[in-house]
UniProtKB/Swiss-Prot annotation:
Enzyme class name: transferase
Protein name, per record: Nicotinate-nucleotide--dimethylbenzimidazole phosphoribosyltransferase
UniProt organism field: Pseudoalteromonas translucida (strain TAC 125)
Keyword Cytoplasm among UniProt keywords: no
Protein's job: Catalyzes the synthesis of alpha-ribazole-5'-phosphate from nicotinate mononucleotide (NAMN) and 5,6-dimethylbenzimidazole (DMB).
Entry annotation: catalytic residues: 320
Length: 353
């Protein structure tokens, strides 16, 4: 379904030379230099010649952050501090402009889109994209969360949305999520893919008690035992323990990479979706930039297993794409120095190593 081209290494020598000849010691801008390298490679995929590349200016265009919302049947078993009704209430808050992600997007220059992937109370707002796969997933410790047909429909929905955003000029896409109970799904995905004990994968989400943590661990262990025959295949894994929003995020990552877009990965839930996407097509990882390490237990280990270094560590545990949103100034700074910082020759400065 997704044909993703590996990043072109043809111009690596030109990128490295340009970075290394800026008026600074080698490597002095640290991780920003690596981000500049990755972004330039992603955004220059259509360039064919050295001459064309030399004239090319890599820029972030119409950065868009999409919040995918979905309800989880497992929430009824008390694995979260909030009831499922809060998902729809927060979608209404996104539409009204009152959530943290609204403020961050307004301040930092993101276009914000909200997608109903399947919540108990359908949003009446015309601003919300209707990609519903149902009202709510089935409890993952009792049944398959959804069918494989629903997973494939979610991928199709995500692909259509990404194509629409691409046509609007977007070349940098971030994802956020809203779904009461979705850290339980993400923990199950993490445990299945990394073959880790559930206790290392389950965290407090938005702040549950010790009693709820124990219940959450038990639920995930039950789910993994019930669905052990489905854990190796990524599509079957999503059907077994995923969420409607996690399915769409996974599909959107794959679709965005297929379109040559930079993909900014948010926190624990989005990183779980990224692991599934990588399992489906490992090349997608070349397009992923991990924005932050959240305060959710397991996220740091997840990032370590993926061998990626996040840009920020702010102890966030909100979701919504807030960490991804906050990374945009760093991405812009990386391209800013790459495009505009003087070289030693331009500035008449003696080159230092």
């Amino acid at each position: 379904m997704f044909k993703i081209a590996p990043l072109n290494n043809q111009f690596d020598h030109l990128i490295h030379n340009k970075i290394n000849n800026k008026t600074k010691p080698l490597g002095a801008l640290g991780q920003l230099e690596l981000i500049a390298l990755q972004l330039v490679k992603i955004l220059s995929q259509t360039i064919k010649s050295d001459v064309e590349f030399t004239a090319f200016k890599a820029e972030i265009c119409n950065p868009t952050l999409v919040v995918f919302a979905g309800d989880h049947g497992i929430a009824a078993q008390g694995v979260s501090i909030a009831p499922s009704e809060v998902t729809a209430q927060m979608v209404a808050n996104f539409v009204a402009g009152g959530a943290a992600i609204n403020i961050f997007c307004q301040q930092l220059g993101w276009q914000l889109e909200v997608v109903d992937c399947g919540i108990l109370e359908k949003s009446p707002a015309s601003k919300v994209h209707d990609c519903r796969l149902g009202n709510i997933t089935a409890p993952l410790n009792l049944h398959m969360a959804m069918s494989t047909a629903q997973v494939k429909q979610g991928f199709s929905n995500a692909k259509s949305l990404v194509l629409q955003l691409k046509q609007q000029g977007c070349n940098t896409l971030a994802m956020g999520e809203m779904g009461i109970g979705n850290t339980t799904s993400a923990a199950a995905i993490m445990a299945a893919i990394l073959n880790l004990p559930v206790t290392q994968c389950v965290g407090r989400g938005t702040g549950v008690s010790d009693e709820l943590i124990a219940r959450k661990i038990n639920v995930v262990e039950q789910a993994l035992q019930l669905h052990k025959a489905h854990l190796a295949d990524p599509i079957a894994l999503l059907a077994a323990v995923g969420g409607f929003e996690i399915v769409h995020i996974t599909g959107a990552m794959l679709a965005a990479a297929e379109q040559g877009m930079a993909v900014i990965v948010d926190g624990f839930i989005c990183s779980a979706a990224a692991m599934v996407a990588i399992k489906i097509n490992p090349i997608v990882k070349e397009y992923l930039i991990f924005a932050h390490c959240s305060n959710e237990q397991g996220h740091q280990q997840m990032l370590s297993k993926l061998e990626v270094k996040p840009l920020l560590q702010l102890d966030l545990r909100l979701g919504e794409g807030t960490g991804a949103a906050l990374s945009l100034p760093l991405l812009q700074a990386a391209l800013g120095f790459y495009n505009h910082m003087a070289s030693f020759a331009d500035a008449g400065v003696e080159q230092v190593v």
